[in-house]
Amino acid sequence: MITIYFEGHALTSDNEANLASGHNDVDLSDGGRSQAAGEKRQRYEGLGIDTIFTSDLRRAYDTAKLMFEGRNIPIFQDARLRECDYGDLTQRPRTEMKAVRAESISNPFPNGESLQQVMDRMKNFIDDLSPNYHGQSILIIGHAGTLWGLEHHVNGIPLTKLISGEFVDTGTFTI
């Protein structure tokens, strides 16, 4: 058994401007750095996290570094944990991306990827965890697509339901 905690990355300037970041490697904002070092750090004190995985995008990795500064917990970056590539809609208003998100489950965003491709990446990542991290508690710091992949593959929630709901940036899963 593996316990997986999920935490969304801290705030970025794109989040604050309500833009769809996708694969844009945007930095944390000042508020995001405070959020990671404060409330997000406190949330995981005393939980016995063995290993941390983040996407390879700065906003996720920097969130982990700030949350676990001074602690001796390994942090690994993995590109499979990236947000969806929104292609031409990257750094466009989130409303534009959300307007075509349902169509993008199986059809890629223009010059980007489909949400199913994100789910496939996440399935591959989850499958790799099982033989290598049995008995551990891991934390994944990622994005909406990362969480949807966990919810879809671990809990069996349909992607159509996940994308129509409100994004909650934490979760706990057992595999």
Question: PLM features: what roles do these ranges have?
Answer:
Residues 12, 146-147:
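Short active-site segment of divalent metal-dependent hydrolases/proteases
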Residues 54-55, 120, 141-142:
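Short beta-strand scaffold positions
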Residues 155-175:
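Domain-level recognition of soluble alpha/beta enzyme cores
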Residues 2, 7-71:
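Active-site-proximal alpha-helix that buttresses catalytic centers in soluble enzyme cores
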Residues 16-19, 87-91, 153:
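Short aromatic-enriched loop/helix-cap "lid" or pocket-rim segments at secondary-structure transitions
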Residues 26-27, 69-123, 163:
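Phosphate-handling substructures
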Residues 4, 136-144:
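Generic beta-sheet signal
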Residues 44-48, 129-136:
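Glycine-rich phosphate-binding loop signature in dinucleotide/nucleotide-binding domains
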